[in-house]
């Protein structure tokens, strides 16, 4: 379990008033149970996270049933821990936000059921939050924040997309992966090379030992117009190369990372040129990759573009981002209109409403 309370905003002696709006956020879309607490005046005041990655590691990937069972065990103790850290109670809450999708249906149901039950018992509103909107807006938790409009690159195990972000809730998808998400490609490539799960961090560490230029892998779809991605062919290229050169794991990992990060950088540059925006936001689990950050920062310097990321601990799934989005929307009057369980394992960002 990891626990963190924002020292910049936190004041444990702070007493709630009628003007305070305190949002509890619950994240349970996959294999991590995250709880966040966002205060209208103090910002993020606490968050807790438990990852069940060790449970799934022996299976080489996330087992949905095991993930759901673990969420059931963790969610209430984590909520209690977050509230206890800041000396608040359930009665201090103004609203509860939960991840309703996209994600694993069983895992989503756990967070949804807990959020709706608590909200009903406390007579406060609940709100369904889009998981990827949470990632997209996570940099707004930092002191240095992006201003709208901006281009967003969302890169995770389940998604790779470029988005035109004009305002909160006003999203247009410019391009997305036609097959494997980049995070999935990292995990599958790691598996081909015999690395452990989760594969992304293990592959990045192995790539640090590789020789640049020992192999040159293609950058998929950069030779054609548009902003869509495709990484399944690159994965096949890795498999064929590894079959010929099984002793060159480090160099293969390096070539794969170079090709993927170069592809992402090229597509980001196109999106920025197309929109004429001067700000890029990068979020999702793969945004933690240091090679990707280096490439995008270099691109930003050349194009005079400001590039923003979440802090490392908020690149992966977390409850803080759900509490943040929940605060934005709940404080503007948006909320669930009924207490029925409602999840959306498949849910497009373009379906979301703008905050008025």
Swiss-Prot record:
Gene3D superfamilies listed in its UniProt record: 3.30.420.40
Taxonomy, superkingdom: Bacteria
Residues binding substrate, per UniProt: 154-158, 187, 200, 289
Pfam families in UniProt: TsaD (PF00814)
Reactions catalysed, as given in the entry: L-threonylcarbamoyladenylate + adenosine(37) in tRNA = N(6)-L-threonylcarbamoyladenosine(37) in tRNA + AMP + H(+)
SUPFAM superfamilies per the UniProt record, alphabetical: Actin-like ATPase domain (SSF53067)
UniProt keyword annotations, A-Z: Acyltransferase, Cytoplasm, Iron, Metal-binding, Transferase, tRNA processing
Role this protein plays: Required for the formation of a threonylcarbamoyl group on adenosine at position 37 (t(6)A37) in tRNAs that read codons beginning with adenine. Is involved in the transfer of the threonylcarbamoyl moiety of threonylcarbamoyl-AMP (TC-AMP) to the N6 group of A37, together with TsaE and TsaB. TsaD likely plays a direct catalytic role in this reaction.
HAMAP family, sorted: TsaD
Protein name: tRNA N6-adenosine threonylcarbamoyltransferase
UniProt source species: Ruthia magnifica subsp. Calyptogena magnifica
